[in-house]
Structures are given as C-alpha cells and as structure tokens.
Amino acid sequence: MTKELSIGSVKMGGGRLLVLIAGPCVIESEEATLRHAERLMTICNGLGMPLIFKSSYDKANRTSINAFRGPGMDEGLRILSKVKESLGIPVLSDIHSIEQVAPAAQVLDVLQIPAFLCRQTDLVVAAAKTGKVVNVKKGQFLAPWDMRNVVGKVAASGNENIILTERGASFGYNNLVVDMRSFPVMRSYGYPVVFDATHSVQLPGGQGESSGGQREFVETLSRAAVATGIDGIFMEVHEDPSCALCDGPNSIPLAELPALLKRLQALDAVVR
C-alpha cells in the first residue's frame, strides 16, 4: 500500500478512492479556466470523486516557437489562486526552473516536475525543499525502475510528499506506448502513482508544428491502469477540444467525462 498524502481537502494513496487530476492543458484565460474548474467540480461532486485541478501557466516545451504557451507565471498563478480560493479545490501546475519554485509554492498545492525535466536534480531538490507535494512525471526516456533515484532525490531533501506519474515511453518516432508493468514497479517505492491518460496517447510532434493524439485509446489504457491499483488518474479535458490552444487531439471532451469516470470508478471499487 502506498503512503497517504493530504493535498488540501483531498486524500491520495493509502488505499483511498481514485483521485482525478484534470483541467485544460494550458490556461487559456481566467474566464475559461474558472468555467472548466466549476464544471469539473460539479462532475466530481456528483460522482463522489476527489478532484485536483490542473492547468499550466507556461507550456515551455511546445513543438513550435509559434505555439501558444499560456499567460506566464505571474498571471497564471493569480488565476490558479482564484480557482483555489473561489472553489476550494487544490491546484497543480508545472514548474520549469528553480526561479519559479518559490512563487509557485505560495499558490500551488502540488508542484509538478515535467517529464522532460525529471532528471534535473537542482529543480527536483528545490521543489522538494518547499515541503509541498511534488508530482514527478516519468520521462519518456526512463524505465520505471529509474524513478527510484528520483524518489531518492526528493526524500533525501526531507520531503516524502511524493507522487509519481506515468505518461508513456517513447516508441519509435512520434509515438508513445504504456508499459503496464510500470505501475506496480513505481508503487513498490511506497508513494502514490498516477496515470496520465491523455499525454500517454499523444503523438509528439506528429503534426509537424504540433503534437497529434489518439484520444480514442484513452479509456482502454485508463481501464487497464486502474485495474493495476493506481492511486490517481490524470486527464486533460476541454469543453471543445477542437478549439483548445494546446493538446486538443488528446484532450477529453468535458461532456464525455462523467460516463468515463463512472466506468473507471467501478473498476477501482473492484481492485481497492
């Protein structure tokens, strides 16, 4: 069994109910962010599912220089603070440099280390030293057992509030595959493990100047991951993915989310 973490009002791990981490890929505007957060809260309250809202203030690893990156740290944190205060739900976002750690920690309940940066010791240690929950996404280039060393970096910094997230492994060019063995391997380190269901079906750079995606496989992979006993599911969602400013091809339409979550909850109840 994994360690139980307290994230605002949400409990994750330790045999608790499956937690949803969800939101638009990037903060598109204050109005859109609050609207998505309110809809997600309504959906999760109706299902009795714990929710952590996520959205990025800066997508620093977009495929093209012309791609929308978000409002930036200052404005993004202001918007996420408003979500947190007005709706009372925990919030998560990515950090990309040591300089971002302190201001982000003043607002965020979870500091997320992006997959491409999971080996950056100084960033991981700086995040850990805040005492905040740190969600480290497993790099597409790492084996699941390599995450033991990442866990060691966080724990050695005096922080055991750790989440590990699987988001697929590189499988040739412009493709990812999910190795289901990664879930029991990473859970064996004693901390909650999350499946990033939407980034795992991404086709990185697959559309030339942007990434493609195969959202039709999200449910299949999510069901398999939940059946292994994971602690949380991570999904990027949008009210209209065709108009999303980031990762639309692999985002889940909000209208389809309740039925999908209900099916995943049923599986979670069996394996709990």
Curated annotation (Swiss-Prot):
Pfam families: DAHP_synth_1. InterPro entries: Aldolase_TIM, DAHP1/KDSA, KDO8P_synthase. Gene3D superfamilies: Aldolase class I. Keywords: Cytoplasm, Lipopolysaccharide biosynthesis, Transferase. It comes from the Bacteria. GO terms for cellular component: cytoplasm. Its EC number is 2.5.1.55. GO terms for biological process: keto-3-deoxy-D-manno-octulosonic acid biosynthetic process. The gene is kdsA. Coiled coil: none annotated. Its main location: cytoplasm. Pathway: Carbohydrate biosynthesis; 3-deoxy-D-manno-octulosonate biosynthesis; 3-deoxy-D-manno-octulosonate from D-ribulose 5-phosphate: step 2/3; Bacterial outer membrane biogenesis; lipopolysaccharide biosynthesis. It is found in: Cytoplasm. It catalyses: D-arabinose 5-phosphate + phosphoenolpyruvate + H2O = 3-deoxy-alpha-D-manno-2-octulosonate-8-phosphate + phosphate. GO terms for molecular function: 3-deoxy-8-phosphooctulonate synthase activity. PANTHER family: PHOSPHO-2-DEHYDRO-3-DEOXYHEPTONATE ALDOLASE. The lineage of its organism: Bacteria, Pseudomonadati, Thermodesulfobacteriota, Desulfuromonadia, Geobacterales. Belongs to the KdsA family. This is 2-dehydro-3-deoxyphosphooctonate aldolase.
